[in-house]
């Protein structure tokens, strides 16, 4: 059996210089995301979302990025889920994209706020019927006696709404407005390149290199 201590690889694919990155972190993110798409990575929009509850307990899970612009990074979920409860108590959160095949990570920190209802409505309407009904059927993060309970709830809402379920009031979008974005490129000998963008009080971005 392979020992965990022996599992390692050397990163050789690319390099990252502060003189080569875009002056704006969103443009730099878009550039790297485009490369991830061109490389046909599986679910390049999958990201770890880390939150902290009112009790100080952190939690993390994978969610999907569904929008990105100068205002931030958008995802959708149940407002009553653990992440929703955490964000209500503490809107500070972090995102992590890990693209193994490109030997890259992107880490984002910032403040999360709900998107406008119209944006949540539009995205909800674009989802497959099963996903729209699932948003009603799932009391996300709550204990449940068995899968049959969830499936029965889904059937009940399917009978109630047919093919036109409205958006549940407990479901919608969040946007993380970044204050810090770090781009990590694996390099040989664990001397990785880490270029970070730090937002100053005036809203401008300062580019810094971090020690690996």
Curated annotation (Swiss-Prot):
A biological-process GO annotation: pyridoxine biosynthetic process
Organism name: Cupriavidus metallidurans (strain ATCC 43123 / DSM 2839 / NBRC 102507 / CH34) (Ralstonia metallidurans)
Pathway: Cofactor metabolism; pyridoxal 5'-phosphate salvage; pyridoxal 5'-phosphate from pyridoxamine 5'-phosphate: step 1/1; Cofactor metabolism; pyridoxal 5'-phosphate salvage; pyridoxal 5'-phosphate from pyridoxine 5'-phosphate: step 1/1
The keyword Chaperone is annotated on this UniProt entry: no
Disulphide linkage map: none
Swiss-Prot/TrEMBL keywords: Flavoprotein, FMN, Oxidoreductase, Pyridoxine biosynthesis
UniProt enzyme class: oxidoreductase
An MF annotation (GO) of this entry: FMN binding
Protein name in the entry: Pyridoxine/pyridoxamine 5'-phosphate oxidase
Top-rank lineage group of the source organism: Bacteria
């Amino acid at each position: 059996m392979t020992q965990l201590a022996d599992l390692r690889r050397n990163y050789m694919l690319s390099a990252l210089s502060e003189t080569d990155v875009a002056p704006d972190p969103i443009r730099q993110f878009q550039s790297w995301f485009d490369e991830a798409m061109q490389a046909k990575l599986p679910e390049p929009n999958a990201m770890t979302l880390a939150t902290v509850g009112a009790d100080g307990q952190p939690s993390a899970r994978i969610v999907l990025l569904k929008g990105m612009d100068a205002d931030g990074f958008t995802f959708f979920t149940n407002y009553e889920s653990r992440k929703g409860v955490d964000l209500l108590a503490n809107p500070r959160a972090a995102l992590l994209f890990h693209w193994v095949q490109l030997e890259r990570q992107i880490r984002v920190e910032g403040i999360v706020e709900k998107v406008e209802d119209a944006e949540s409505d539009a995205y909800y309407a674009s989802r497959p019927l099963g996903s729209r009904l699932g948003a009603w059927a799932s009391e996300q993060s709550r204990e449940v006696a068995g899968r049959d309970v969830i499936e029965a709830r889904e059937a009940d809402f399917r009978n109630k709404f047919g093919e036109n379920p409205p958006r549940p009031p407990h479901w919608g979008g969040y946007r993380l407005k970044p204050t810090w974005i770090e781009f990590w490129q694996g390099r040989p000998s664990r001397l990785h390149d880490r270029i970070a963008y730090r937002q100053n009080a005036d809203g401008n971005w300062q580019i810094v290199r971090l020690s690996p």
